Amino acid sequence: MRNWSWIVGLLVIVAAAEAHWDFLLGVQNGHAAVILPHPQPLQNMSLLFGQYIRELGIEYYYENGRPQLSAASVQTVWISPGLIGRIGSTDVACQSGCPNYFTMPEDGHLHIRFRATQPGIYIWDLRVVDAIDIDGNPVQDMEGVYRIYFKAGNPHYLYGSVDAPNYQGDLYPLNLTVQIRQGSQTVQTVSMPPVPNALHAYMASFEQAGSYTVVAKLDKHLSRRVDNLNLSGGVQADWQFLVIGDVNNDDLIDDADLLMVLFAFGTNEFAADANGDGIVDDADLLLVLFNFGASGEGRD
């Protein structure tokens, strides 16, 4: 009887997943887009047969009784280690060895099942690409990414906002690194790109609860630090990165950063573009010179 109850429970979960959509694809401002919901709510994964599982339904958005799209594909831009998305019997989204791309079927209705083996917070960043509207016209690819957070089990995690007021570009190409420390020892490090318009700009899970020093660093910016943070369950930690110019990301603004900017001067080299405006010029040079000699709080 116990085995039958597991099967019945699984069928109930699958039936519930089949009965609704989790996000809708359409057209917004001339680009392919995820129309609803914004932001995507936290997806809680269920533990079944030793794996954490969550199935997501994807459909086309309807307007005046007609779908906005007749075709579209979904591209994985970034995915957490250990999270795998499968359609049917094929893994289509994972960190390595998957196509990280799939095409919607003709009926515009698809389910993708995600799995993970360990508790934690997992991330799937996607773009809608190669879309065609209902009248047969090609649609420009989605701008930016759409982020979905998954929660497996009861992890200890940090979440919050990421603000970089002196950076003019998109924050997504920058890497956010969050580290927990005890004394001089680094206990664990988690990295991801931030998405300010998601449910939270970042969510990062850690294996052990405890009291830690937390250090966060955003590429091209000096690190910030919070001491004696009690990490247990979900804890909010918002980050504002004010000091910019660390283009080589060693948490110190010095000769190495100055040389990077000088050698790339007049180009659009992303790594040396301190302020993110798309060109390496006087503004980047002035930022490095103004903050010359400064070091991140995580180096103290």
Where on the chain are the PLM-derived regions?
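Contiguous segments within soluble domain cores/interaction surfaces
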Residues: 20-111, 132-154, 167-169, 175-184
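Structured interaction patches on ligand/partner-binding surfaces of diverse proteins
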Residues: 220-242
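Alpha-helical segments with a strong preference for the paired helices of cellulosomal dockerin domains
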Residues: 247-268, 277-298
